[in-house]
Each structure stands twice: as C-alpha cells, then as structure tokens.
C-alpha cells in the first residue's frame, strides 16, 4: 500500500508564546501521528502526559449530542483536520496550535475576543446545520459534556447554555438548584440561571475563565489517580 510520507510542522502556543514544536506524519493507514520535536519552556500544561492525548482531549467528545455530525461536516473528525480548522482552541485556557509557517497571532484567533459562528452555535445546540462555510471559529468544537449545549456572546459577556435529556429536561433545573446550594456554601461559586433557548429549557452560566485565569480539571491535576477526602483537604 502506497502512502504519503510528508510531514507538517506545528507549534503549540500559549497566547503568543511558543511552547512546543511538533510535527504530524501520516502512517500507512493514512492515520495522523504526532511527534514532539523541541520544547521552548520547562513548563507543561497541567495534566500533560503525551502529545497525542493532550490534543485529543482538546476536542469535544463524540458522544456529546449533535457534535459528531458537526465534527464530520467541518472536517474536524480527523485529528489533524481538527487542528487545522479549530487551532485546538478552547475557552478553558489560552493554548492553541498553528502551522509553523502560519502568520497568525493570538489576537487573530482568541475565542475570548473574536466573534463566534452563530451558525455553529445553533447547530451544536439543536443539530440543524444550515451552512457548511466556516467563516469564523467556534468554541463548540472544544467543549465537552454529554448534553447539547452552546456558547453565546451577549452584551454583558459570554454564556454557556446547556439543555437536558430529550424527555424530562430536568438537568437544567438540577444545575440551577445545585448552584443555589453552592452559593450558600461558597459565595464565589459560579451562578446559574434558567431560561428557554430555541424552545428548550436551559441552564445558563457565565464564562468563568479568561485570558488570565484558566480551568484545570481535577482529573488533569491528579492525572487520574484516586485521592481520599482528607488528602484533598
């Protein structure tokens, strides 16, 4: 079987700081494989283990409602296609990926400051894709979870709208009630509200990360190791 031995050079960035040079090469099955070339810093993203796993974890899981169709529609189901289309951007942090010879900077791609694609936001929520042209990037490709959700940029900030199960829709109510308890225990907890979006009950919360503050999940901090309550405290 003939296969291409070409390789594409990429750079893992943190805003405008180059962190890692790496390359992608296709194997005999035309599957992309990623290889580290040179780190420019002793620091690593929290939870970083292997490059391939790190990049895969930046992509929305296929089990998230409506997302697999979106990934396929825009050529993001392939790991390298995901990098080229989305730059592995996320609203969790300020890491991103560019091709080594691309004249891009953080200001060009930041999800915190640039417009979102409304078409993709709506498709991520209800599964209806009305256009195939990706004119602007979207945080939907890098948002995990199970139920349908989407990000909306409003006058007062960026908000996450989350729906629930198709039959009972109790999950938004559960999140709203849990937030009331959380605010009693911790006044700095993220506030949740309820509402309707595209005729569905949703929970709504503001984005709590920024270009200065990121989100690191406990699974990344502890790298999957079990911890007891006393150890956590």
Give, region by region, the residue ranges found by the protein language model:
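Phosphate/dinucleotide-binding and metal-coordinating scaffold of catalytic cores
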Residues: 1-233
């Amino acid at each position: 079987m003939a296969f291409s031995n070409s390789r594409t050079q990429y750079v893992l960035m943190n805003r405008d700081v180059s962190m890692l040079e790496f390359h992608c090469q296709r194997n005999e099955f035309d599957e992309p494989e990623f290889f580290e070339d040179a780190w420019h810093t002793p620091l690593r993203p929290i939870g970083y283990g292997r490059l391939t796993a790190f990049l895969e974890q930046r992509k929305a899981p296929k089990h998230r409602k409506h997302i697999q169709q979106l990934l396929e529609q825009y050529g993001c189901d392939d790991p390298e296609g995901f990098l080229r289309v989305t730059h592995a951007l996320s609203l969790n942090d300020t890491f991103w990926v560019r091709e080594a010879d691309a004249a891009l900077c953080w200001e060009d791609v930041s999800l915190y400051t640039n417009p979102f694609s409304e078409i993709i936001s709506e498709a991520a929520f209800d599964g209806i894709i009305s256009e195939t042209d990706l004119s602007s990037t979207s945080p939907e490709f890098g948002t995990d979870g199970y139920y349908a959700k989407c990000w909306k940029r409003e006058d007062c900030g960026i908000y996450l709208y989350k729906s629930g199960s198709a039959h009972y829709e109790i999950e938004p109510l559960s999140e709203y009630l849990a937030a009331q308890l959380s605010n009693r225990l911790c006044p700095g907890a993220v506030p949740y509200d309820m509402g309707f979006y595209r005729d569905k009950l949703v929970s709504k919360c503001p984005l709590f990360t920024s270009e200065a503050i990121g989100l690191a999940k406990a699974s990344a901090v502890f790298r999957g190791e079990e911890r007891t309550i006393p150890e956590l405290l």
